[in-house]
Amino acid sequence: KPAVVEQARTPHQNAAQAAAKPGATDGAELIAQAFAEQHSDVQVSGSGKVHRTLPDDTQGSRHQRFIMKLSNGQTVLVAHNIDLAPRIPRLQRGDTVGFSGEYEYNAQGGVIHWTHHDPAGRHADGWLEHNGQRYQ
């Protein structure tokens, strides 16, 4: 059964805390660098706006999918495992989503996944935040 949705202390709190640190960004800078250098397996966090929602990927583990636009204009696919974490209900274009996950390079802009807890405890836990709720 997916993990319980947690109430975030404030919407996008972790992203806001990261952005408040000297030299930190909303995650767009690190993702842009990983894309330019074609790096994968990069732990990232920040926030972006939903550019487009996509049908769920139902092959293998089920994933809620959407395209997110970052503050620098780059778009990335978010693939959120809904077998391990709750789906974000009523997600719409223009919504702000905070994230912590792993970036994987592809020529279309990349993918952010591992936006959930790791039941085996071998990988950094990730999450998504939407309207004050954390999904992990």
Predicted regions and their residues:
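OB-fold and OB-like single-stranded nucleic-acid-recognition modules
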Residues: 1-136
